[in-house]
Amino acid sequence: MVIDTSALVAMLSDEPDAERFEAAVEADHIRLMSTASYLETALVIEARFGEPGGRELDLWLHRAAVDLVAVHADQADAARAAYRTYGKGRHRAGLNYGDCFSYGLAKISGQPLLFKGEDFQHTDIATVALP
């Protein structure tokens, strides 16, 4: 699976559906995250919880054995195409900059996307069904 910022923020913020996201992560042995999404997640978490939140993020990623995938040209191209098709102001999915990197990694890896919200369900990307 590819983990989007929205899912990881839900888990680290202990939102009501956090356990469902955690169960989905535990059920899949492939756990990928774009380094662009990692930065986006760190910015959100540290804005909410300060540097201790950032340390908790890094610890969570380590314990969950999430593979941070560097942004290369193929991921960037897929992200760019996602914005062209599904970007905010262009399509009802309304993908933002960070969303496009999650989409791009899911597209090039062939892995389903774990996310919170309704944006990605309006795209052609495979998604993770929550337990």
Curated annotation (Swiss-Prot):
> Which residues of this UniProt protein bind Mg(2+)?
D4, D99
- Where's the PINc domain? 1-129
EC nos: 3.1.-.-
Q: Which InterPro entries match?
A: PIN-like_dom_sf (IPR029060), PIN_dom (IPR002716), Type_II_TA_system_RNase (IPR050556), VapC_family (IPR022907)
Q: Give the top-level enzyme category.
A: hydrolase
Keyword Ligase listed? The answer is: no
Sample GO molecular function, one term: RNA nuclease activity
Q: Indicate yes or no for the key word Magnesium.
A: yes
List the GO biological process terms.
negative regulation of growth
Q: Which UniProt keywords apply?
A: Hydrolase, Magnesium, Metal-binding, Nuclease, Toxin-antitoxin system
Cofactor dependence: Mg(2+)
Pfam families membership: PIN
Q: Which family does it belong to?
A: Belongs to the PINc/VapC protein family.
Protein function: Toxic component of a type II toxin-antitoxin (TA) system. An RNase. Upon expression in M.smegmatis inhibits colony formation. Its toxic effect is neutralized by coexpression with cognate antitoxin VapB30.
What name does the UniProt record give this protein?
A: Ribonuclease VapC30
| Organism per entry | Mycobacterium tuberculosis (strain ATCC 25618 / H37Rv)
Lineage of source species = Bacteria, Bacillati, Actinomycetota, Actinomycetes, Mycobacteriales
